[in-house]
Amino acid sequence: MTVAVSTKDSTREFAFEKADFKNVQKMLFKKAGINLSDAKEAMVYSRLARRIRARNLRSFNEYLALVNKSESELEQFINALTTNLTSFFREPHHFTALADYLRQHNVTNIWCAASSTGEEPYSIAMVVAEAFGSFKTPVKIIASDIDSKVLAKARAGVYPLASIAKIPHHRQKQFFHKGKGTNEGKVKVVDELRNMVQFKKLNLTDAKWDVKGPLD
């Protein structure tokens, strides 16, 4: 007698087979151009199970069918699966090179194509402001990301105080306000610096990009 053995994890609310994970990988690459590592299987289940539950669906197949036809759910799908790891001046030598380049060339447009929560474009803006000795410069800084949630955080410009710990004191004083009272433990990018950066939602797989060149 042959006994069929189910591969379903009995601890999971929804069935999640290898084929379901592969379909998620294909959908994310098709819609956002993002390659999802095979090591992310547990993360995918955890994050998308919440969406399946929220939409009162019964399976990953039903959910992906919804993603395929609903722009609003596609946005939720992408937001759920994008991982945003960033920090101010994350690669210091890049910003040293940028400062040198600004001194030697006529730069008019800078595009940060995966801006996440804004630390990188604001770091660029600090370097530009220092190079020109002013917040008012001829340089236009464009920052884009596919994730609408991280863009909202970037536009707000509010961060944990610990996130600027490695930034020199003179930059902290010039470019950030420290929170008080209920905002203690937070910092906010000064308005003059925020105004130097234009944030846009943009999918790099789209045929046309809402970014005007030339870019430096």
Annotate each PLM feature.
Residues T2-W111:
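Conserved AdoMet
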Residues E41, P92, P121-A125, R155, ...:
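Conserved strand-to-helix beginnings and helix N-cap segments that scaffold or border functional pockets
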Residues A97, P121-A131:
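Short, well-ordered amphipathic alpha-helices
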Residues L98, S115, A154:
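Conserved hydrophobic/aromatic pocket- or pore-lining residues that grip, position, or stack substrates
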Residues L102, V128-F132, V158:
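Active-site catalytic pocket residues across diverse enzymes, especially alpha/beta-hydrolases
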Residues V107-S123, K140-I142:
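Conserved class I S-adenosyl-L-methionine
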Residues N109, S134-D216:
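Extended basic-aromatic, gly/pro-enriched interface segments that bind polyanionic ligands
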